[in-house]
């Protein structure tokens, strides 16, 4: 019976890992659909390279920093050979170490790819690649160690079941730093500083991406049990209810606020609910999940407006609001509604992770800006990154209207 349970755990964790991997396709579709056609190929390349670089650098360095030893702040063993961390039977945290490693790898790549959309349409490809490697080496693994690797936050009882904090808030705050440092797209703001809408070129692609992400989120949250347990259905229910509540509330808020139900904002509402419930999906009941999702559905609308109109940070896909703000919201709500969780502990974790992430991300992007540069030239941005960065177009033989 014990061997059967281990095999079931292995199969379930691998299924979860495969679903989380496919979230890369969801992010690629959302980001491509919400931006202009002339930059589609560049966005697809960035999403692919997030997974490629995340896989390699997390294997070589990141996994050791995250899970190598019981130091409260940083892992200290397993560099370049993470499988050396396994016990004599090749097991790690109750699973064969290869199974555990691939599951953690896809989570790392998910955090990295959140930044792509926020910096879309004006960022140098080489600079983005360096960022993508860096987050997989020393940003995500360090805070991940604090939360999931036996570090100081886990020791004081901080709860982040599937990554509202460790994955989404970290990625969202890196997106905030990156979007601020690279600056807004040409034509995003008038001379008076008023924001100008720059519509995405393909809402059907964006919708497909949202559906893919919603589907894969069941692997993200339910798979985080890393075991075939009886509470999988409960986790799936809280995940789905939060997303549904957030979507409906965002639709209503935009309908009232703008006079019509906004399509792209409503899609982001679904993602906001999923992000917000990810920390607490295992420790809240169904109605608490609905409430968390509903609040996220309101917050995401006003967060997008705040960054767009008040602080004037250009985020083409709303990644900062969806992942950064709603990740923080989910972190704190876990302390209010989560069974056995403590608000002060969650607040401490939020502040610590936010401070570390923002400081490191701003330093990284500042260095890139002052050395090789973060931004493409004005001509490259106006013409489109596909042709200038990659020498081809995602839509061959189509004519684009290139405006500023």
Model-found features: residue ranges?
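Hydrophobic alpha-helical transmembrane bundles of multi-pass membrane proteins
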Residues: 1-404
């Amino acid at each position: 019976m014990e061997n059967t349970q281990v095999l079931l755990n292995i199969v379930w964790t691998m299924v979860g890992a495969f679903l989380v991997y496919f979230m890369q396709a969801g992010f690629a579709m959302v980001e491509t659909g919400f931006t202009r056609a002339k930059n589609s190929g560049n966005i697809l390349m960035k999403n692919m390279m997030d997974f490629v670089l995340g896989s390699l650098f997390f294997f070589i360095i990141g996994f050791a920093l995250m899970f190598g030893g019981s130091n409260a702040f940083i892992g200290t063993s397993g560099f370049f050979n993470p499988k050396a961390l396994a016990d004599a039977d090749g097991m790690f945290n109750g699973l064969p170490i290869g199974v555990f490693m691939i599951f953690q790898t896809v989570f790392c790549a998910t955090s990295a790819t959140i930044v792509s959309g926020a910096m879309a349409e004006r960022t140098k490809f080489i600079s983005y690649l360096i960022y993508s490697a860096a987050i997989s080496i020393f940003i995500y693994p360090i805070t991940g160690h604090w939360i999931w690797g036996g570090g100081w936050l886990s020791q004081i009882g901080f709860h982040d079941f599937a990554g509202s904090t460790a994955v989404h808030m970290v990625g969202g705050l890196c997106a905030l730093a990156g979007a601020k440092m690279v600056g807004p797209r040409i034509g995003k703001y008038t001379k008076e500083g008023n924001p100008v809408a720059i519509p995405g070129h393909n809402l059907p692609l964006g919708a497909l991406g949202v559906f893919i992400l919603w589907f894969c989120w069941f692997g993200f949250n339910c798979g985080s049990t890393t075991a075939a347990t009886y509470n999988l259905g409960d986790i799936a229910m809280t995940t789905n209810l939060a997303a549904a509540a957030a979507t409906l509330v965002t639709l209503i808020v935009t309908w009232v606020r703008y006079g019509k139900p906004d399509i792209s904002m409503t899609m982001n509402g679904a993602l906001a609910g999923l992000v917000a419930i990810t920390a607490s999906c295992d420790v809240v009941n169904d109605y608490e999940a609905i409430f968390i999702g509903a609040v996220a559905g309101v917050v995401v609308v006003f967060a997008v407006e705040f960054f767009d109109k008040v602080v004037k940070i250009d985020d083409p896909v709303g990644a900062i609001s969806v992942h950064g703000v709603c990740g923080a919201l989910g972190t704190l709500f876990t302390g209010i509604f989560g069974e056995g969780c403590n608000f002060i502990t969650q607040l401490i974790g939020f502040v610590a992770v936010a401070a570390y992430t923002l400081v490191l991300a701003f330093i990284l992007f500042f260095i890139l800006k002052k050395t090789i540069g973060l931004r493409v030239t004005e001509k490259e941005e106006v013409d489109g990154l596909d042709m200038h960065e990659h020498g081809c177009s995602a839509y061959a033989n189509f004519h684009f209207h290139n405006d500023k």
